[in-house]
């Protein structure tokens, strides 16, 4: 099971999952017809009307999951999803949705997998994006709120220098799982010792310089800057959203988005699109407020030329 607008990779089985706005990434490869369910993403600001809409989408998505489970009770190995969809449009979800999925996974004996390749390693202001789903005042070992939404498996990559998965105790219900049986999963181009040593140094520097906290603090500043930018360009910018430095906004059309990217390049800035008409921000963890200010100045100039 997976969500519409997801992105889980461009090799092997993941191409049966990826639902990219760019069809070239998977169109020429054979794929399994695995079930894809409604993506109940939040439209910001989360006012009463938008909340009603997202609750309706959540019910639709959960019902689609339940319907497939009822028709194929023994065929579902897992459900995989991104805590925040990246390439699909920087789509955010409510914790209540993940909690329902966790309950279904326990009731129907399938694993819940969070793909944190893009959202992991601090950029959202927490080490892993799914940690935002805990109650604000939860303790580290909370078993009431946090464990009711935690995944069974997490995938990681990109900033970690090598890709992989780690898993919780529920995997031990499976005899001879991949952490017990050698070579069940293998890779010619997988991680190597140099990658792992380099990432170890990165982790040490992140802890030493408190970069996850910095991403949280400067992320709030970036989001406030984007909200201010929207206020000055209310006819163009909508749906400002973000956690930590993982921020985005929407433009009226794909053409507006592509033109803005081109304008930003002319100003000397590299910026990425996502979804069909969104702009996403992915600063480095130690970005400074002064650099964010510079980016906003460039963005205002680029917007004025649309």
Where are these regions (language model features)?
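Conserved N-terminal phosphate-binding loop of PLP-dependent enzymes in the Aspartate aminotransferase
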Residues: 1-306
């Amino acid at each position: 099971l997976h969500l519409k607008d997801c992105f889980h990779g461009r090799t092997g089985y993941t191409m049966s999952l990826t639902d990219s706005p760019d069809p070239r990434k998977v169109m020429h490869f054979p794929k399994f017809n695995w079930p894809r369910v409604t993506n109940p993403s939040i439209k910001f600001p989360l006012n009463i009307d938008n909340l009603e809409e997202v609750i309706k989408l959540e019910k639709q998505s959960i019902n689609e999951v339940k319907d497939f489970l009822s028709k194929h009770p023994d065929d579902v190995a897992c459900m995989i999803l991104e805590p925040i969809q990246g390439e699909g449009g920087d789509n955010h979800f409510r914790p209540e949705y993940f909690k329902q999925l966790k309950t279904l996974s326990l009731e129907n004996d399938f694993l819940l997998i969070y793909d944190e390749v893009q959202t992991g390693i601090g950029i959202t202001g927490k080490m892993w994006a799914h940690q935002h789903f805990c109650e604000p005042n939860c303790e580290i070992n909370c078993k009431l709120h946090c464990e009711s939404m935690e995944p069974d498996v997490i995938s990681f990559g990109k900033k970690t220098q090598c890709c992989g998965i780690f898993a919780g105790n529920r995997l031990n219900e499976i005899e001879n799982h991949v952490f017990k049986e050698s070579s069940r999963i293998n890779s010619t181009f997988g991680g190597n010792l140099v990658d792992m040593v380099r990432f170890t140094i990165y982790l040490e520097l992140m802890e030493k310089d408190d970069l996850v906290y910095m991403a949280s603090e400067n992320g709030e500043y970036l989001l406030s800057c984007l909200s201010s930018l929207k206020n000055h360009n209310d006819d163009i910018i909508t749906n400002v959203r973000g956690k930590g430095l993982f921020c985005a906004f929407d433009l009226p059309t794909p053409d507006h988005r592509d033109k803005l990217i081109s304008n930003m390049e002319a100003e000397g800035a590299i910026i990425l699109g996502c979804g069909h008409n969104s702009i996403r921000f992915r600063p480095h963890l130690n970005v400074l407020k002064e650099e964010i200010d510079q980016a906003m100045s460039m963005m205002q100039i680029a917007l004025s030329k649309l």
